[in-house]
Each structure stands twice: as structure tokens, then as C-alpha cells.
Swiss-Prot record:
One of its GO terms (cellular component) is cytoplasm. Its EC number is 2.7.4.22. ATP binds at K9, L10, S11, G12, G52, R56, T159, Y165, D168. The gene is pyrH. It holds the Pfam family AA_kinase. Pathway: Pyrimidine metabolism; CTP biosynthesis via de novo pathway; UDP from UMP (UMPK route): step 1/1. InterPro entries: AceGlu_kinase-like_sf, Asp/Glu/Uridylate_kinase, Uridylate_kinase, Uridylate_kinase_bac. It comes from Synechococcus sp. (strain WH7803). This is Uridylate kinase.
């Protein structure tokens, strides 16, 4: 066990698989299987999930919606994903709690930092939904914020690619992957990892970020064990 407490950031797009929209139950099942191994190893795990598989605030804003309104709709989409993820994890035998930044007590606990930490200490997975509760902030920034609040040792960003590249590997065959890089390199190079607010938060709080491919079975466990997969960003 390389990390005692970790925060896993899952994009909404990751949950939809190849469907193009919504949630692929097979993806949820695969994530639950990986997470079960992590919890069994003794690592405390929190998860922040995005909502882009259902609704993305920026796209809504581009289509003419008020930006704040669009972001609130996006936050509600993350709650749908969080509850679905909770169901999948619990069916895999993992005790899980959902906490939301916008209060909706009939379906989830409100976000309370000390309660979240207590859940983690008891071996429960905590899934954070509704972003940070404020428009104009991404779920990547939420991941950095929650990681700092719960004193996580690391942020894992599970994506569709196997690390950070100097350019889009899907478009350019000569794209080069970084094994390690600094927060300053990411910020000055404008590399597509997380938005600058999220990167700056992790930089200021000295929380490393590991970017890896979610769709390779067992990768979440490998990342938690400290195996050299993906790209590691640190000070």
C-alpha cells in the first residue's frame, strides 16, 4: 500500500463507455471490481465524479443558457452518477456513502468534512457529488479541493489515455508521453490535464496527481500500490 488515503477523479465520460451518452453498467461494474481491491488493501478511498456523460455546463452555456444555471444542471448530473456508482460499489460489497455539496437529504448526505473523514476511517468509500456547490468551478477543481480538505496523499485522475502527452495522442502519432513532470510545467505548458485552478490547488497543497488509463483492468489498484503507471505530476 503506497498511499494511506487517496482521491480518485472519474470523468462522467468515462462512465458512458462507448455508448455516447448515459451510464454503461459494465464500466461501473469494472470500476467497482478495481475499487474493491483497493479497499481490501487498506487504502482509504474517496471519489469525485463528473457529469459530462449527461450534461456539461460549458456546452449548455455555449448553446445560450445562463452559465451559472447550466453549471447547476451539470452538478445535478454528477449526483446521478454518484448514486449510480454507489449502487455498483455496494453490489460489489463495498460500503459507500454519497455526500453532495448541494443539500438533498432524501438521496444523499450533505457534504460535511469531518463526517467524510470518519467514513473513510471506517473503511467506507465516499463519493462526492454536485461538484463544490458553486458554478464556474469544474469537477477537477472539486477533486483538488476535496483532496486538500480530507488530507489525501494523492489525486488519481482516471482518463481515456495512459498519461499526459505534449499533444493529443489521438490526433498526433508522434505525441510524447511524460512519465513525470512538475505542476509548473503543466501550468506554463498549458497541458491538457486539469484546469489551472485544480493544478494550482494541488501545487499549493503539495498533493501529487497521477494520470492513468481507467480502461485497463486493475489500473486503479496499480496506481494505489504506487506502481509506475501513467504520468505523475508533483512539485
Amino acid at each position: 500500500m503506497a498511499y494511506a488515503r487517496a482521491l480518485l477523479k472519474l470523468s462522467g465520460e468515462a462512465l458512458m463507455g462507448d455508448q455516447g451518452y448515459g451510464i454503461d453498467p459494465a464500466i461501473v461494474q469494472a470500476i467497482a471490481k478495481d475499487v474493491a481491491g483497493v479497499v481490501a488493501s487498506g487504502t482509504q478511498l474517496a471519489i469525485v465524479v463528473g457529469g459530462g456523460n449527461i450534461f456539461r455546463g460549458l456546452k449548455g452555456s455555449a448553446a445560450g443558457m445562463d452559465r451559472a444555471t447550466a453549471d447547476y444542471v451539470g452538478m445535478l448530473a454528477t449526483v446521478m452518477n454518484a448514486i449510480t456508482l454507489q449502487d455498483g460499489l455496494e453490489r460489489a460489497g463495498i460500503p459507500t456513502r454519497v455526500q453532495t455539496a448541494i443539500e438533498m437529504q432524501e438521496v444523499a448526505e450533505p457534504y460535511i468534512r469531518r463526517r467524510a473523514i470518519r467514513h473513510l476511517e471506517k473503511g467506507r468509500v465516499v463519493v462526492f457529488g454536485a461538484g463544490c456547490g458553486n458554478p464556474f468551478f469544474t469537477t477537477d477543481t472539486t477533486a483538488a479541493l476535496r483532496a486538500a480538505e480530507i488530507s489525501a496523499d494523492v489525486v488519481f485522475k482516471a482518463t481515456k489515455v495512459d498519461g499526459v502527452y505534449d499533444k493529443d495522442p489521438h490526433k498526433y502519432a508522434d505525441a510524447v508521453r511524460y512519465d513525470t513532470l512538475t505542476f509548473q510545467q503543466v501550468l506554463s505548458g498549458e497541458l491538457a490535464v486539469m484546469d489551472s485552478t485544480a493544478i494550482a490547488l494541488c501545487k499549493d497543497n503539495n498533493i501529487p496527481i497521477v494520470v492513468f488509463n481507467l480502461f485497463e483492468a486493475g489500473n486503479i489498484g496499480r496506481a494505489v500500490a504506487g506502481e509506475p503507471i501513467g504520468s505523475r505530476i508533483s512539485n
